[in-house]
Amino acid sequence: MGNHCTRIPCCKKVCSCICCCNRRNKTQARSQKGSYFIKGKVHPVSRMEKWEEKITEANSHGKILVVNFKASWCLPSKTILPIYQELASTYTSMIFVTIDVEELAEFSHEWNVDATPTVVFLKDGRQMDKLVGGDAAELQKKTAAAANLLLRQS
């Protein structure tokens, strides 16, 4: 692809390279770890009970659950967060959650999350789409497509 990964902490072109935010590079990026909090329509999931609550809510109301697997030390995860927040405010017919891959490491592994951010779209508990990497335009496109699917089913 022509992009060169600097690995400290991320690529020169954040949106198209996901190699830098895999788990093996987290140690290098830790020194630049900043805190960022989720507010508003995005629900942080740090316990399996909260996951069960959100997936049950989505399934019982016929909503799409959008799951952002992130890492606090990952620059693309931080970069995409405001866009994810904006999408959650725009598409209120969907439920948006974030999962820190270190807080729920085993669960993230079960969902085959090898790089962050990874965004998974679920309908009726089943994966309908997935985005790996911090491509904001692609995230917006996939979210709009999921919303259109909900409209057509209404």
Swiss-Prot record:
<feature type="domain" description="Thioredoxin">
    <location>
        <begin position="23"/>
        <end position="148"/>
    </location>
</feature>
<protein>
    <recommendedName>
        <fullName>Thioredoxin-like protein CXXS2</fullName>
    </recommendedName>
</protein>
<dbReference type="GO" id="GO:0005829">
    <property type="term" value="C:cytosol"/>
</dbReference>
<keyword id="KW-0413">Isomerase</keyword>
<dbReference type="Pfam" id="PF00085">
    <property type="entry name" value="Thioredoxin"/>
</dbReference>
<dbReference type="InterPro" id="IPR013766">
    <property type="entry name" value="Thioredoxin_domain"/>
</dbReference>
<dbReference type="InterPro" id="IPR036249">
    <property type="entry name" value="Thioredoxin-like_sf"/>
</dbReference>
<keyword id="KW-0597">Phosphoprotein</keyword>
<comment type="similarity">
    <text>Belongs to the thioredoxin family.</text>
</comment>
<dbReference type="InterPro" id="IPR050620">
    <property type="entry name" value="Thioredoxin_H-type-like"/>
</dbReference>
<dbReference type="GO" id="GO:0003756">
    <property type="term" value="F:protein disulfide isomerase activity"/>
</dbReference>
<comment type="function">
    <text>Possesses low disulfide reductase activity, but efficient protein disulfide isomerase activity. Does not possess deglutathionylation activity.</text>
</comment>
<keyword id="KW-0963">Cytoplasm</keyword>
<feature type="modified residue" description="Phosphoserine">
    <location>
        <position position="31"/>
    </location>
</feature>
